[in-house]
């Protein structure tokens, strides 16, 4: 029903059939001040990260249209976050079995950040890019799933998939070793 539609230009382009690609494929260079934050895992007090994030990048992400979660998972993480976050976490999992390393990372992701829903924090749904977790005071399940998937892929080299449930999101990890527990099969991998 066109009477209830909003147009920026009321004309149909017959050849315009491709949706807009919102993927961010290269790091976004922004000037701005750096915001630093210290985060610590509760079950592993020696796992401490002093992060640094560019406020200019956060301003860019603040107004970014809400997208499919693959956009957040696939977006590059800033050099600042990579350089300040990854070395401490890499050292914490060095030499550990995959299951132990994954548990250290999930404990960091679940306990170093305070929880609040997007509705409570912003008044609307706002999925985060990885850098945003190190800026805002709160995060929720989909933000943490995106961060955990990044850490597991980057630090452990394992495949992951996001699992979307009603009002919840989690990350499944494809381990190279046998792990007790529930599993799913995606593209022939368990």
Tell what function each PLM region has.
Residues 1, 134, 185-189:
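Short, intrinsically disordered, charge-balanced linker/junction segments flanking boundaries
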Residues 100-104, 108, 136, 140-147, ...:
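Extracytoplasmic/secreted proteins, especially bacterial periplasmic and envelope-associated proteins
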Residues 94-95, 143-190:
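Hydrophobic/aromatic-rich core segments of domains that either
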Residues 58-65, 124-131, 190:
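Short low-complexity stretches enriched in small and charged residues
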Residues 1-43:
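Intrinsically disordered, low-complexity N-terminal segments that are enriched in acidic
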Residues 69-134:
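Secondary-structure boundary elements
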Residues 38-93:
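Long, charge-rich alpha-helical interaction segments
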